[in-house]
Amino acid sequence: MTRPRPEAVDNQSPKGWLCIVLHAHLPYIRHPECEFMLEENWLFEAITECYIPLLAMFDNLVNDRVPFRITWSLSPTLCSMLTDPVLQQRYVKYIDRLINLAEMECERTKRMPEFRDTARMYLDKFLLCRKMFVDNDSCDLVSHFRLLQDAGVFEIITSAATHGYLPALQNAPRSARAQVLLGKESYRRWFGRDPAGMWLPECGYYPGVEHLLSEAGISYFFSDAHGILFAQPRPRYGVFAPLICKDAGVAAFGRDSASSKAVWSAKEGYPGDYHYREFYRDIGFDLDIDYIRPYIDPIGIRSTTGIKYYKITGKTEDKKPYVREEALRRAAVHAGNFMFNREKQIDYCASLMDRQPIVVAPYDAELFGHWWYEGPQWLNFLIRKMAFEQNTVGLCTASDYLSANPVNQEAGPSFSSWGYKGYSEIWINGSNDWIYPQFQTMEKRMSDAVETHREAGSLAKRALNQMAREQLLAQSSDWAFIMKSGTMVNYAQSED
């Protein structure tokens, strides 16, 4: 007997709204001249552990007719890599190697009951990734995102061209303008329409950037909480309603700290639960080097494979085997807890406001599935519970909210980012501040070259375009972040 499908709760007029934003970005890394480049694995890992699992989960929601609206920010550098034939072919080779490794692991663990189900889980996952990537999407995940946007469940927004940290480009205003305008143009090429919103890289806002957004036809952006709370004049509704930037007409939505901490924090948030998979125990480091060598860096440097057999367990190196069923039960509990807290939050805010409050919850997309393995299923449980188990909070996008609430308070947001301590300490410090005078020099040389060769032929124009590409790629916020974090520093310096 077929189980009847539960009816969705009427969420047409909830007391308030939850706006979930998934920001997907990776730095532009493409080395066709090298047979193997470890840094390209950042993309391949994200495809396998994050993008495909999330897309598969959202497909299931659509097939089950579960109502939802989710915002995605896809950076132009990520879209460029996802649509690049060289990287697409390399991903197929990458996933084929993982399938082979998972098959070996199923054989190795067949008499190890504590690990064999997990080994099979990975094999099934890798086979699904290959099927979706090659058979379903013809190696083009961007088309899959576009399909879900056209279906009305995603709102996809853009970001700056190469994810340049815009507050660091205040002294290179032409570069900041190019980052914004090219971010819009890139989006139009992939999605066949103009973006409604723009993700400011690292949520980096400085007073005046809204005029660049207005010039590009951008309607809204997201800010960290203090960017809204310290606005002038003081925001009437805190972060629970957008502000309209003075003289620009662009809306600024503030991040909600409570919903952020619940998911971001490994110590206080859900991802630190002891039943969840341990990120740092990978067979690339645990197993014999001769066994694992064909699946790691060819020169023999140990690296992650994505196959991990242990759960967090606790603050100890003695980890217990991962049990998928236990982890999923915890994910369902945590989804219910998150929903309950948002219901109470909306109940309280709605009692104090003359409009429906909005809770903005932005996250790095790579958190879901990569850092927090159970993240995609947590999100799946949350969306289903919100559709069928309550009627206080609805899911919406920023565009949805602005359409329903076109009149909002005018104010000037405060300088801010979502980085450490809320300002620019990560991207401008003693480890990386040497790059910013170079940006100004590059901008001056680029401007001079354009003036000198304005009437030049096609070859000179190609050279100018290449100069512009190199300049934009050097401005990516990722290189400054890597220099500060102390990992892969030599690579970041070579790219900057």
Q: Where do the model's predicted regions map?
A:
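Active-site and substrate-binding clefts of carbohydrate-active enzymes
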Residues: 9-69, 74-117, 124, 128, ...
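Core alpha/beta catalytic barrel or barrel-like domain that forms the active/cofactor pocket
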Residues: 21, 154-163, 193-201, 254, ...
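Well-ordered mid-protein domain cores that form the structural environment of catalytic cofactors
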Residues: 110-196
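His/Asp/Glu-enriched short active-site or ligand-binding loop at hydrolase and phosphoryl-transfer sites
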Residues: 218-231, 397
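CE4/NodB-like, metal-dependent polysaccharide N-deacetylase domain
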Residues: 175-200, 341-353, 357-362
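Conserved short loop/turn motifs at secondary-structure junctions
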Residues: 194-205, 364-368, 488-489
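Hydrophobic, small-residue-rich alpha-helical packing segments that form membrane-like cores
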Residues: 204, 209-218, 249
